[in-house]
């Protein structure tokens, strides 16, 4: 084996030289140079600096502006809450442990950090699924005269919590476990060891299929059908400038969403699956650290895509920051860009 396994940890380095130490008790500077740990801490600080304001502002602006309290925006708010979970309970912990060079908070802290990081990530991922399904049902109309209302939104939000807890909870209850990963400064599910006493392999397979492949498939299906529907509508109404604009806006949003999803999550999932299928092989600590930390940047990408690209949200944010005035003068224009398209007409194709 090219790693060192101990109680509640796995260090991706052989202990033949005797230098490997418990990542809960000693700095891990034999895995990487101190400046690399400092770079991770600086990166996490940047994510906190960007992620907290934009997600908190999303919640604050929605509470302040009644016109934003629409069923579809419940999902957007849930997305912001998920990102705040990641920022407050995951990023802050990882920043501090990176500054110290090891997971200073012990096994209990590792379980807490791993749980909230996984919970936040899964809540965000399943929120994207609910948004994709909502867009598909409203625009593609597989059910005629369907109106996405408050009840549907609350059901969607509840589903994101149920699915997130179904992924983040089992390692705390004895099905798999959370351990330090990569450079040992953040915690995640144990992909590294079979650990039969906690049925680790079955949980990783379950997590990969149910909580990664399934949502990815749903998102691609829904947005793929959405693009086809918009193109078909544009072909039937060649002279409709509104439809042409809707096609461009929806297509742009879909492309950005898909790219950001792939950039954030596929590297992490791919590396995790490789480690799981090649347990005991030789790979360095940075091999898992880079994709794991990069996946955390989804806390910034998501609100940019689903909120800042929406004129109504954007203008309300500007008005809040500018004490009720919009220096861009788009108040009236923004009113026409409806976030609540899912609650109104079923006869038009409308971008989110």
From Swiss-Prot:
An example GO biological process term is: absorption of visible light
Could you list this entry's UniProt keywords, alphabetically sorted.
Answer: Chromophore, Disulfide bond, G-protein coupled receptor, Glycoprotein, Lipoprotein, Membrane, Palmitate, Phosphoprotein, Photoreceptor protein, Receptor, Retinal protein, Sensory transduction, Transducer, Transmembrane, Transmembrane helix, Vision
Which body tissues produce this protein?
Pineal gland. Instead of the rod where rhodopsin is generally located.
Q: Which residues are glycosylated?
A: 2, 15
A Pfam family matched in the record? Rhodopsin_N
Q: Which residues cross the membrane?
A: 37-61, 74-96, 111-133, 153-173, 203-224, 253-274, 287-308
Q: What is this protein called?
A: Rhodopsin
**Recorded GO MF terms:** 11-cis retinal binding; G protein-coupled photoreceptor activity
List the residues marked with site Plays an important role in the conformation switch to the active conformation: 113
What species is given as this protein's source? Anolis carolinensis (Green anole)
Q: Where is this motif: 'Ionic lock' involved in activated form stabilization?
A: 134-136
Q: What family is it from?
A: Belongs to the G-protein coupled receptor 1 family. Opsin subfamily.
Q: Where is the composition biased (Low complexity)?
A: 337-352
After translation, the protein is modified as follows: Contains one covalently linked retinal chromophore. Upon light absorption, the covalently bound 11-cis-retinal is converted to all-trans-retinal. After hydrolysis of the Schiff base and release of the covalently bound all-trans-retinal, active rhodopsin is regenerated by binding of a fresh molecule of 11-cis-retinal.
Function summary: Photoreceptor. Light-induced isomerization of 11-cis to all-trans retinal triggers a conformational change that activates signaling via G-proteins.
């Amino acid at each position: 084996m090219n790693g060192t396994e101990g109680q509640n940890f796995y260090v991706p380095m052989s202990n033949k030289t005797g230098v490997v130490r418990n990542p809960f008790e000693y700095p891990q500077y034999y895995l990487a140079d101190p400046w690399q740990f400092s770079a991770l801490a600086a990166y996490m600080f940047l994510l906190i600096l960007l992620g907290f304001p934009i997600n908190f502002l999303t919640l604050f602006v929605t509470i302040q502006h009644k016109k934003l309290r629409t069923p579809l925006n419940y999902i957007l708010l849930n997305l912001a809450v998920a990102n705040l979970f990641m920022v407050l309970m995951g990023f802050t912990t990882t920043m501090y442990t990176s500054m110290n060079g090891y997971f200073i908070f012990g096994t209990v802290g590792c379980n807490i950090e791993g749980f909230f990081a996984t919970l936040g990530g899964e809540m965000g991922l399943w929120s994207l699924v609910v948004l994709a399904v909502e867009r598909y049902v409203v625009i593609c109309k597989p059910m005629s005269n369907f109106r996405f209302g408050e009840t549907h939104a609350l059901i969607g939000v509840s589903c994101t919590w149920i699915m997130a807890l179904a992924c983040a909870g089992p390692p705390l209850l004895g099905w798999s476990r959370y351990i330090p990963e990569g450079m040992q400064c953040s915690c995640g599910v144990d992909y590294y060891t079979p650990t039969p006493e906690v049925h680790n392999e079955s949980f990783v397979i379950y997590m990969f299929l149910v909580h990664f492949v399934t949502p990815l498939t749903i998102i691609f299906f829904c947005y793929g059908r959405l693009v086809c529907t918009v193109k078909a509508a544009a072909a039937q109404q060649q002279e409709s400038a509104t439809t042409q604009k809707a096609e461009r806006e929806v297509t742009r949003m879909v492309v950005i969403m898909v790219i950001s999803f792939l950039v954030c999550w596929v590297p992490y999932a791919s590396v995790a699956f490789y480690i799981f299928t090649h347990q005991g092989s030789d790979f360095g600590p940075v091999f898992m650290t880079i994709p794991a930390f990069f996946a955390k940047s989804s806390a910034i990408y998501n609100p940019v895509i689903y909120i800042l690209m929406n004129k109504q949200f954007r203008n309300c944010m500007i008005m809040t920051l500018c004490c009720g005035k919009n220096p861009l003068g788009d108040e009236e224009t923004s009113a026409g860009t409806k976030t609540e398209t899912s609650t109104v007409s079923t006869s038009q194709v409308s971008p989110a």
